[in-house]
Amino acid sequence: MVDFATRVAKSFKDKVSGIDNKKGTDIQGVLGLDSTPNVLFASVFAAGGGSYDNFFYKVENGRADFRNFANKGTSYKNLEKVYNDYKNLIGSNGLFASKDGSYSSNFEKFHQLAFYVGSSSGYNYAFADETAKRLKFGDSAIEYPNDTLEIKAPTNNSQSGDGNGGTNNDNLLGTFDIREKSNGKKGESNGKQGNGQDKKTISLYKDSIPKEKTEGTDAILISDNQLINQLQTAAKTSSSQNKANTAAITFKQSNKSETDQSTTSQVIGYTTTASLKADKKNIFDVKKLNNEKSERKIIVGATVETLNQANTLQANEAIIKPAPGKYQSTDSHKVMITQGPNIVGIHANEKEDKETQKFINWYLNKEESWSVQNSGSTTTKKQTAAQYFAEQSSYITPLKNNFKADQSATKDSTVNTNYFTKQTFDLFKEVNDGKVLGFNDPSDFRSGKFRNTIGSTFNATISSKVDFNKFFENFKASLGSGFER
């Protein structure tokens, strides 16, 4: 896989630009890696015959033993081979490594990567709809986030609420609309219209919020001066454009039409609760509403670009294969990384142990009614909590009974409708049958730092292009002490 990607990158040098001058709308490379720690761990584990004795570390008696790594044993030698193979791809500008939330699928779906290695959990974000949208700012672009709402400029009819029925808009920066359940119970503000929902306007203010408004309920206070300036500038621009449009109305139109035209709100930004990294240039953190679980962002200085199917990747076009289970064809065992939440029982006392057992029984066996989003509409589905969680997360429920049953009959419905989980199901079945080795990071209190550090150090080499000795030196220095044994 790495060799093929390297050959492609070398064959199309003019299409794969260097890292220093790569724009967000350019081709990002040939091969994308969503998790470099996963790739390095799986490769070294497979190259070591699928044995933890040949891995960076193993856990014995609850503590990790790093001597194989520290003493430059088999894991060091295998890491050197893996690194040098990837270095050839890096030198050809053919590798993209995800960071800061920019997953490979964000570029793959817009034909900016040839292929990538990711997780089954990314299925819902891996493909474009029939018409996909992007937000562009300068040379950068992001996919139009889920749950995104337009921010409208203040209009002549906007009420800042000075308490005396005035219309002083000095503090009002803009507004956006959310949808709430019509029974009065507050729902998640996802902006989606549907039956049983009422529109509610949220106002954005600078300096202070009028006394008849409540922060977190129908108002948000903006404190970042750069964001305030950008919203105000966008509002002034839209106001000028609106006046020009009004002046162009012919005398044949009624006064009512002129009034309607002059009070039409213009889009000055966007707000979303999707997972985005604030850059304080175009994407800003703001306070969330009281009923929201996710952090809220405001996006400014962006234009919307709509792409048709010819420019995007749909699910029925993709070739989906399991990630390579061997680093070299001569490796003795095929390996699959298994990641996801684990249920860990911790003994407390007899009463709490019984309650934990009740929860596990409910989680795995008791069917409940769940609200499920499907093609823009909400339906109710009878599932166990485990099945619901797996379906919503694009995971599978790896129970032995599921693997014994005929795949088409399994209750884990995502197996039949989700291309990623079908592959994952088949691989887990091979693990269950002993044909594939399932790999999980051995863990103690140091393993998280080891994983994060090897990933960040490797990602840095995409621009630095250092040799293995320098990479290893940087890795050891970033790790610090505590990994000698």
From Swiss-Prot:
InterPro entries per UniProt: Lipoprotein_10_C, Mycoplasma_lipoprotein_cen_dom, P68-like
Q: Where is the composition biased (Low complexity)?
A: 155-174
The ranges of region (Disordered) come to: 151-201
Highest taxon listed in the record's lineage: Bacteria
Q: Where is the composition biased (Basic and acidic residues)?
A: 177-189
Please give the family membership noted in the entry.
Belongs to the MG185/MG260 family.
Note the NCBIfam families from the entry.
Answer: lipo_P68 (NF045826)
What name is this protein filed under? Uncharacterized protein MPN_147
The organism's lineage is: Bacteria, Bacillati, Mycoplasmatota, Mycoplasmoidales, Mycoplasmoidaceae
